[in-house]
């Protein structure tokens, strides 16, 4: 693995903060959990003194140095996987991710990912941590993602995400009849026993999801959602928590719940929709280098449009029977 050296100076306004919190602010391209691991592994120096206590308080003005081996993106293969590029300049790429595409290689997905595609599309991105990936979408969630082509761009985008300056909106179809919008403000953490899943947990990290009603159908509701935070599976977990799991999300309880007397054509559409009904429809951010406010929209994918058409047709066919 390649070795890198990170250095910075603790700012006066950070006086009294925990060391791990300070490092997360100074090096936002790395997660706080990774920085904490480096501290505990004796890889962090404060004024040339090794410290291994994440909760140690900083005073301001200290010199920080971290010498560490990091994951080598060159070990991943560049693959000629088509990317739907919505926007690109010297600093960022915005893509519209299709379904069935994993963002980053991992267990069970060593290749065939967005990262592999980025390495092929723009080879210099190998020098950027995680090949410039700033945030992720689940394998079967479609829509907009921003990727940084340089380390300065990535650092700024990660910092803006942490400060909730980047707006991400989604469209979804939730199970059940919802009559009003609202906010789910529930912290999240890894599931206690199913470690690949997430769950609402009082000791978890803050997670906030806003939602509003777009359209009601029989047994289902079309939603527009906005993230304040970006926890793994956040929308899926939050909607399941309020008893309205996303249609098609078998992981978090969104198995098909066909309405009474539904047509065979409608049932066929439900059976064929084998993913969570979730699409990242809008992305708004300040360009990390120029500061210009930029905004993109991604049209709903074909399978999502087909689903909405079927839900609407079923609703119209049975609207005389409805009591709401």
UniProtKB/Swiss-Prot annotation:
InterPro entries, per the entry: PsdUridine_synth_cat_dom_sf, PsdUridine_synth_RluA-like_CS, PsdUridine_synth_RluC/D, PsdUridine_synth_RsuA/RluA, RluA_PseudoU_synthase, S4_RNA-bd, S4_RNA-bd_sf
Gene Ontology biological-process annotations: enzyme-directed rRNA pseudouridine synthesis
Reactions that this protein is recorded to catalyse: uridine(1911/1915/1917) in 23S rRNA = pseudouridine(1911/1915/1917) in 23S rRNA
Active site: 138
UniProt key word rRNA processing: yes
Location relative to the cell: Cytoplasm
SUPFAM superfamilies, sorted: Alpha-L RNA-binding motif, Pseudouridine synthase
Enzyme Commission designation: 5.4.99.23
An MF annotation (GO) of this entry: RNA binding
Disulphide connectivity of cysteines: none
Annotated coiled-coil segments of the chain: none
Gene Ontology annotations for the cellular component aspect, listed alphabetically: cytoplasm
Domain S4 RNA-binding residue range list: 17-90
Keywords in alphabetical order: Cytoplasm, Isomerase, RNA-binding, rRNA processing
Pfam families: PseudoU_synth_2 (PF00849), S4 (PF01479)
Described function: Responsible for synthesis of pseudouridine from uracil at positions 1911, 1915 and 1917 in 23S ribosomal RNA.
Family: Belongs to the pseudouridine synthase RluA family.
Protein name: Ribosomal large subunit pseudouridine synthase D
Species for this entry: Haemophilus influenzae (strain ATCC 51907 / DSM 11121 / KW20 / Rd)
């Amino acid at each position: 693995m390649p070795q890198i050296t990170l250095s910075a100076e603790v700012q006066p306004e950070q006086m009294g903060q925990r060391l791990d919190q300070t490092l997360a602010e100074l090096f936002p391209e790395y997660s706080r959990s990774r920085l904490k691991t480096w501290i505990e592994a004796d890889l962090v120096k404060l004024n040339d003194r090794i410290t291994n206590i994440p909760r140690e308080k900083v005073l301001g003005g200290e010199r920080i140095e971290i010498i560490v081996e990091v994951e080598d993106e060159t070990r991943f293969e560049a693959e000629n996987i088509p990317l739907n590029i919505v926007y690109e300049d010297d600093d960022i790429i915005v893509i519209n991710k299709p379904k069935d595409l994993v963002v980053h290689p991992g267990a069970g997905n060593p290749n065939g990912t967005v990262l592999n595609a980025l390495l092929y599309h723009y080879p210099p991105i190998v020098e950027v941590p995680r090949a410039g990936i700033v945030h992720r979408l689940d394998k079967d969630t479609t829509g907009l993602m921003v990727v940084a082509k340089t380390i300065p761009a990535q650092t700024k985008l990660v910092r803006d995400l942490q400060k909730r300056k980047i707006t991400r909106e989604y469209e979804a179809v939730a199970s059940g009849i919802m009559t009003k919008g609202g906010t789910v403000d529930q912290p999240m953490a890894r599931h206690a026993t199913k470690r690949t899943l997430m769950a609402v947990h009082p000791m978890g990290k803050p997670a906030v999801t806003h939602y509003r009603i777009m359209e009601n159908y029989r047994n289902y509701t079309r939603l527009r959602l906005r993230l304040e935070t970006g926890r793994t599976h956040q929308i899926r977990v939050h909607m399941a928590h309020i008893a309205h799991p996303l249609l098609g999300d078998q992981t978090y309880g969104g198995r098909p719940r066909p309405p009474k007397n539904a047509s065979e054509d409608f049932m066929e559409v439900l059976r064929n929709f084998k993913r969570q009904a979730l699409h990242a429809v809008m992305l708004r951010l300040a360009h990390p280098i120029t500061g210009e406010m930029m905004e993109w929209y991604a049209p709903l994918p074909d399978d999502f449009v087909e689903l909405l058409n079927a839900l609407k047709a079923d609703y119209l066919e049975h609207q005389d029977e409805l009591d709401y």
